[in-house]
């Protein structure tokens, strides 16, 4: 399947997810290329009369939402989100556990997902795996102070490689919340809950990109249509 075909399928799934939104809802707006299609469709529906408020998971999503004409709000006004829609870098078959954060917004994405009554994830057919970590590293957001020490402790958790993320200019990547990201290559992860607990105990770690037991539904874009997966 070509990249163009894949984008067509992702757009179809993203628009289907956007059509789940109803007037009166507060919507978590994901980050990334797939989520961008969802934001585009929500903008069309707002222009047609849909009344919603969005909470974006990144500065980029905020910009896209404003350009699409979607009214925005924040957690000072709404503590709960009716539905959050986002992409993922890996989804584990069966459990629907996820790896997210290769787009650099994992902290805000996880805050929004946790606050959502329903968390819908959109992926293409290359993202499902039997075990998390088969293809994607686990992004770990860390504070910059002492990151070298934090990286050593992540390696001690079993990471085969720990690499600070850089931007296109080769400088250290900085998240919207002012932190760094260390991409940790663990390989296939047999016990993600245990690994998550180990990472959470490391001083300097802000958040990791394993979204465990959080997805309500996953829409998988395939050449034959959109598959709906539930835990």
Swiss-Prot record:
- List the GO molecular function terms: ribose-5-phosphate isomerase activity
**The protein's enzyme class:** isomerase
Membrane spanning residue stretches: none
EC no. given is 5.3.1.6
Query: What does the annotation say about its assembly with partners?
Result: Homodimer.
Gene designation per UniProt:
rpiA
Q: Which reaction does it catalyse?
A: aldehydo-D-ribose 5-phosphate = D-ribulose 5-phosphate
What is this protein called in UniProt? Ribose-5-phosphate isomerase A
Query: What InterPro entries does the database record attribute to this sequence?
Result: NagB/RpiA_transferase-like, Ribose-5P_isomerase, Ribose5P_isomerase_typA_subgr, Ribose5P_isomerase_type_A
Look up the signal peptide feature and give its range.
Answer: none
What's the short name of a Pfam family annotated to this entry? Rib_5-P_isom_A
Q: Which HAMAP family match?
A: Rib_5P_isom_A
User: What organism is the protein native to?
Assistant: Gluconobacter oxydans (strain 621H) (Gluconobacter suboxydans)
The catalytic site is made up of 109 (proton acceptor)
What SUPFAM superfamilies would the database entry show? D-ribose-5-phosphate isomerase (RpiA), lid domain, NagB/RpiA/CoA transferase-like
Reading the lineage from the top rank, the first entry is Bacteria
A Gene Ontology biological process noted in the UniProt record is: pentose-phosphate shunt, non-oxidative branch
Family, according to the entry, reads as follows:
Belongs to the ribose 5-phosphate isomerase family.
Task: Cite the binding residues for substrate.
Answer: 31-34, 86-89, 100-103, 127
Q: In which pathway does it act?
A: Carbohydrate degradation; pentose phosphate pathway; D-ribose 5-phosphate from D-ribulose 5-phosphate (non-oxidative stage): step 1/1
Quote the function comment for this protein. Catalyzes the reversible conversion of ribose-5-phosphate to ribulose 5-phosphate.
Query: What UniProt keywords are attached to this protein's entry?
Result: Isomerase
